[in-house]
């Protein structure tokens, strides 16, 4: 069916909720977007243009999906809620730019954390071309999804993600700030981070207790050479194990011998009294590489 009122509006969302007896499921972190300006802001931040291949995570009732399609995107969406396929089939436009919906939209009923992108998208996307990822992420699973996408084989030009504002601030945090930590470092060694817009809690139905923000992550032309990434991430996490402790104290797990710790920090010209949030990303890379050398 064709509707003039956008799905991303309180009136249309309420009508869908009543028609299908659907509700936002807390266990899936669902909150329906009912602010068209916010949704269109996400689409603009993602730079969606006609012909773009878009992977969406968690389409819900289609608030964002509809606007991605209207902007010209070809959308493959991952969803786990079995109550939503009927709603999406009925409520998204039957035709988009003269094409039937099934030519522009594919619903993949699978947890994105278990996605096999090459198989899932074959036959729908041209896999020789990159995609753009756009998502309104459930708060409780934001970080695992980000890491899953970064570590996947999916060829993407950008990740445009709405998430809890606090997590967005952690992604973009710089040394010296309270938000700076392992997540900031893990992401910033691979991606540029742009806080595109903030979305207040009143933009959702039901309203969450916290505000959200939209972040655009773009792969760096030259990602930082961190060596073994799992080892690097482990070193960083252990360095931040106790934020109020000094760097020397936090390194005890990795280097139990005090002389080893003192030598490593002296060789790297790092003050053992510093706290981890005072170190630049390059310092953590040097620490990780030095520990790897010591363990050979």
Swiss-Prot record:
S-adenosyl-L-methionine binds at residues 31, 33, 58, 79, 111, 136. It is found in: Cytoplasm. PROSITE patterns: RRNA_A_DIMETH (PS01131), SAM_RNA_A_N6_MT (PS51689). Keywords: Cytoplasm, Methyltransferase, RNA-binding, rRNA processing, S-adenosyl-L-methionine, Transferase. It catalyses: adenosine(1518)/adenosine(1519) in 16S rRNA + 4 S-adenosyl-L-methionine = N(6)-dimethyladenosine(1518)/N(6)-dimethyladenosine(1519) in 16S rRNA + 4 S-adenosyl-L-homocysteine + 4 H(+). Pfam families: RrnaAD. GO terms for molecular function: 16S rRNA (adenine(1518)-N(6)/adenine(1519)-N(6))-dimethyltransferase activity; RNA binding. Its EC number is 2.1.1.182. GO terms for cellular component: cytosol. Specifically dimethylates two adjacent adenosines (A1518 and A1519) in the loop of a conserved hairpin near the 3'-end of 16S rRNA in the 30S particle. May play a critical role in biogenesis of 30S subunits. Belongs to the class I-like SAM-binding methyltransferase superfamily. rRNA adenine N(6)-methyltransferase family. RsmA subfamily. This is Ribosomal RNA small subunit methyltransferase A. It comes from Lactobacillus delbrueckii subsp. bulgaricus (strain ATCC 11842 / DSM 20081 / BCRC 10696 / JCM 1002 / NBRC 13953 / NCIMB 11778 / NCTC 12712 / WDCM 00102 / Lb 14). The lineage of its organism: Bacteria, Bacillati, Bacillota, Bacilli, Lactobacillales.
């Amino acid at each position: 069916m064709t509707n003039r009122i956008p799905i991303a509006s309180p009136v249309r969302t309420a009508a869908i909720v009543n028609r299908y007896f659907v509700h936002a499921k807390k266990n899936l972190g669902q909150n329906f977007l009912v602010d068209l300006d916010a949704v269109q802001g996400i689409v603009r931040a993602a730079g969606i243009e006609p012909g773009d291949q878009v992977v969406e995570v968690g389409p819900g009732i289609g608030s964002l999906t509809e606007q991605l399609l209207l902007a010209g995107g070809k959308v493959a969406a991952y969803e786990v809620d079995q109550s939503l396929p009927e709603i999406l089939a009925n409520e998204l436009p039957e035709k988009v730019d003269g094409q039937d919906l099934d030519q522009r939209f594919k619903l993949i009923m699978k947890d994105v954390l278990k996605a096999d992108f090459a198989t899932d998208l074959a036959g729908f996307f041209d896999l020789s071309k990159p995609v753009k990822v756009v998502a309104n992420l459930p708060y409780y699973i934001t970080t695992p999804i980000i890491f899953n996408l970064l570590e996947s084989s999916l060829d993407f030009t950008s990740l445009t993600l709405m998430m809890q504002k606090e997590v967005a601030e952690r992604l973009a945090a710089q040394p010296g700030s309270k938000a700076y930590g392992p997540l900031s470092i893990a992401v910033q060694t691979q991606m540029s981070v742009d806080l595109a817009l903030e979305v207040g809690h009143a933009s959702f139905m039901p309203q969450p207790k916290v505000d959200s923000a939209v972040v655009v992550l773009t792969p760096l032309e030259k990602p930082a050479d961190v060596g073994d990434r799992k080892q690097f991430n482990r070193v960083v996490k252990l360095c931040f194990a106790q934020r109020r402790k000094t760097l020397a104290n936090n390194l005890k797990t990795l280097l139990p011998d005090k002389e080893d710790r003192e030598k490593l920090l002296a060789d790297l010209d790092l003050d053992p009294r510093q706290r981890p949030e005072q170190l630049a990303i390059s310092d953590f890379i040097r620490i990780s590489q030095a520990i790897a050398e010591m363990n050979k």
